[in-house]
Amino acid sequence: MFADSAKIFIRSGKGGDGHVSFRREIFVPAGGPDGGDGGKGGNVIFEVDEGLNTLGDFRLKRKYSAGDGENGQKKRCSGKDGEDLIIKVPEGTIIKETETGKVITDMSHENRREVILRGGRGGKGNQHYATPTMQVPKYAQPGQKAMELNVTLELKVIADVGLVGFPNVGKSTLLSRVTNAKPKIANYHFTTLNPNLGVVDLDGADGFVIADIPGLIEGASEGIGLGHEFLKHIERTRVIIHLVDAASTEGRDPVEDIEKINHELSSYNEGLLLKPQVIAANKTDVLYGEEEEEAINKIKEAFESKGIKVFPISAVSGQGVKELLYYVSDLLKTVDATPIVFEKEYFPEENLVMSEPYTVEYNETEEVYVVEGPRIERMLGYTNIDTEKGFEFFQKFLKENGILDQLEELGIGEGDTVRMYGLEFDYYK
């Protein structure tokens, strides 16, 4: 079954905890701390797989987790890093944060592989915390927590030309005639429930990729029927071909059909109407003489004044199809060929960390002030507080984020101890 959207849960690996231990060997009475570091958690990586053309696999499995880092061990042994998780998707897949709908990344064109969630940093063992004044550190740094995210995957086909029209106007028939695609063809509304792609080869001219966008109905832009599922596939195309039933075999007016579809395109995304359009007036094989001329002229009068070319064709007999294809090939040369790639709007590492608050509490049992939270943990992970510059940055961070104010509100005094993820400091103004 073709599937062009799916919602899944992803989780990176947690960092392993640093270890607290001391060297215990004969003839070495005071060997000092030798706790090893925790391993790094695995990343969640998305990768394009050329062999995939659907998101159907994600209907069977909804939760994906990378490996956790192992904890550190004694004798300075570091824990093993967690295994990365590689999730393979078809080219053209857009990854969005589910709650906001913002784009995390677009897996198309040059973007073939991207880390979406990074694994947690491994905690430092107590071997790192020995100082001249603290030779027996009995604490180690815990591993950084895993990152979790609900994401929506959307597959938007990549084609030069989008073929649009109401059900039963002959899109599948035309596609099967001009390409090697083998779409199912039947006279039922919504027979085509997935975009069919085909390559048009032309003698002496540039070929192109064409996508048969499944039949649209009024209200598609509001999600009626399978509207949103279909309309999104038009966003990557560079030229739109309107296929209409010029013979009105089902009683519809072809001019009204085009206007209705353009209304749906505009309601979904106004930018779609900026794409060049061509009209293929189909089923002329069932019209004769003045009847055909009258039907075609009616369409031309409505649209050629707007710069939209009209081609009378028959998808069944092939009449007029070659002229249509060569015109579209020439038209594509005038259209910007820059790949349509959706820009990033959501940055998991930044958004997830900044959205979670920190806590400042007093532990009466240990008589220590404890500061925790992803922002604190991340800051400590990339700041070397053993250097003068790093320590100045650390102090500035505490002040700008209101942590010092909260400590004072809790009644901290000179010389009191503050703990942050295995690190302890004495408080002085």
Swiss-Prot record:
Residues 1-158 form the Obg domain. Mg(2+) binds at residues 172, 192. GO terms for biological process: ribosome biogenesis. Residues 159-333 form the OBG-type G domain. GTP binds at residues 165-172, 190-194, 212-215, 282-285, 314-316. This is GTPase Obg. Monomer.
